[in-house]
Design a protein with these regions (language model features):
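Short, small-residue-biased leader/transition segments that mark boundaries at the very start
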Residues: 2-6
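Terminal, non-catalytic domain-edge segments
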Residues: 8-10, 17-172
Length: 172
């Protein structure tokens, strides 16, 4: 059922994706796909949309390379530096010191992620009685998985999707 949602999104996104629209939706879909180990054909469908739109983004590249190691990095920039440039910092830190990368990600989750989305329509939905499914920084969970970080210190932090990252820890 969860993969049906992705398939449905793949059908509708091409009609609505604009140069500045659907960046976050694609980031979320890629991130959730990485965390929940979606089938390659689903991830490939997302990748094809990115290719078709020539969307060059560091986070997209990092996540895609995790599933498809032959993917060539298209850029060392993020399409939306605020708040997403942190992904570059965390990735670079992880190459040298994974514990420092987790600390930086923790700071991002605590102080920067929600505030960095203040210009989006869903920001502060909880204050207006609007039904919503919470605020989730899906890309943080995907980065933890991709970079092989120990996220035990992130468990319970607002916005961090710990259970998604660890959904299959006990399934063998």
């Amino acid at each position: 059922q969860r993969q049906m949602c992705i398939r449905d999104s793949l059908k509708t996104m091409p009609r609505f994706w604009t140069d500045n629209g659907f960046y976050i939706e694609m980031l979320w879909l890629l991130s959730i796909g990485i965390m929940l180990d979606y089938e390659d054909d689903l991830i490939h469908g997302l990748v094809q949309l990115i290719k078709d739109r020539e969307a060059k983004d560091y986070i997209y590249d990092t996540l895609i390379r995790y599933r498809f190691p032959d993917w060539e990095r298209t850029t060392n920039q993020v399409l939306y530096p605020s708040p997403y440039r942190i992904a570059i910092t965390v990735t670079e830190l992880a190459e040298q010191d994974k514990a420092e990368a987790v600390k930086r990600l923790e700071k991002y989750l605590k102080k920067e992620w929600y505030r960095g989305h203040s210009d989006l329509s869903w920001h502060d939905d909880h204050k207006y009685g609007i039904n919503h499914d919470g605020y989730w920084c899906f890309e943080s969970g995907a980065l933890v998985k991709v970079l092989g970080l120990d996220d035990s210190s992130l468990k319970g932090l607002p916005y961090y999707p710990y259970d998604m990252v660890h959904w299959n820890d006990n399934i063998k």
